[in-house]
Amino acid sequence: MGLINFKKRDEIDELFEKLRSSSEEVREDAITKLENMQLGIEQGLKVLELAKNKFPPATYEWQDISARLIDICTDKPYVEYISKVESIYDELNPNAKISVLQFLATYKNEQAMIAYLKLLRKDYLNLKNLPFGNLLENPRFPQILFPGILKFTENNEIASQIYLLLLYYFNYDLVDEEVLSEYRSQIIQDILKMVDKVMNYTVKSSSFWDDDKYLELRSNAGVYFDLAGYIRDPKVTMALKRLMSVKDMRLKMFAAISLLKHGFEPAKEDVIDIAGNGEVRNWFFNSLVKMGRSEIYPEEYRNQKCFAESNMVDWLVYPTELGRVPDEIELMNIFDDEDMEYYLFRFRCCSSEYWQEKGWMAGVAGPFDKRNSPTTLAEGHTFSHFEKWESKRPEEHFESIVGNLKEYWMKLAQE
């Protein structure tokens, strides 16, 4: 057994020398070999120790050797790594420090969460983004994380991400308002400031979808206005009421839901405005169902056509897709597949020079289970190739989109 460990130690030493090579190809070969090794505890601790060293600069930030050494070890972690990364943290470069924080925020261990908060305290003012691992998907240890992490909202760059974490912990009923402690008044002030920013903002172009600064503001504001529902304060309630006049239906929806949590009913016309908006219709309905308040949802939008349209639009607004709500969208056909339904739409976007040239384009939403109709739940085939509508017959558009997706999912299942 000792001989095996000795060989692995020698191999790590040899690879370490290659990691210091001026040749990127040699370095990449060495890091790949390390990635493929089955590191034991001692070998992992040794690799973590090596991460303290300086290596030749990488072409791209993601190629940083020190950070990748941390990632290699923490991909298959041992509890012993927690105290080790704590001890070497101050000697690491900024990229490697981020990798350490990501590890501690991902490892489902109480000691790791304590170390995460401790190390975050050292560098939070220097962060541009908050490394929070899988805490959104798997929120845990609220008694460790809060209220301590709220101090770090002093760094405006990461404040909205910390509030997003807090929002998730509220949503999972892991915290209540008492956990805010001395930070409650600051959170209230931050919400009020965000309301002022939104209400006073002047969009710099014909459509806010072309205003990157506003899109960043709207993304952050959604977190604040959603969080506001858990902060019972008259000043917050008044600020939420102000937002009922905002033109952005996404922000208006968050404000309306939060007002309901405060015990105030939004006006009927405001509810109709929100439900009439394709981007947020399904979010709004699902939120009301979760709250047990679906009775206020307008019947005119409680049907499968409207839910399918919203599902299509929600897919289209992704930055990697259309990146905006289409100016027009029309249902062209419904295709049945046993108990499932697919909705074929055409849409166009005249407010964008790039998309205007494409004219009407085809997209499919669904499939939706007819047995649960009307439902907002699509089964994963919502998609568009952004092909011109006139380039194919409706049936051909449907087969082109759904056929390709079915092949993709089948190949994925076979791998």
Predicted regions, residues:
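Long, helix-rich interaction regions
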Residues: M1-E17, S22-D29, V47-S99, F103, ...
